[in-house]
């Protein structure tokens, strides 16, 4: 099955950063247009009360989308590995921002 993976980005005590908000909005539009489930990924730093994945999922609670929060990982590699190992993801559209697109593509390719 193909998924839409939303990579984590900063959140501030439960409020999404501009970058995370943009990723989630784009993912929701894409997933709805292509009838795909969404996986939000991203853990939390020491002292944080909320995970990046949890904040992203909460943004989508009112949408009629199939959303899973995988509250693990602190970087692109660990987030993609968690999606593969915990949820069996082998095919996905990965939502990130333009500055991270090439690096994300290379990491995804390396990790299978």
Tell where the protein language model's regions lie, with residue ranges.
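A structural signal for short, hydrophobic/glycine-enriched beta-strand patches
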Residues: 1-112
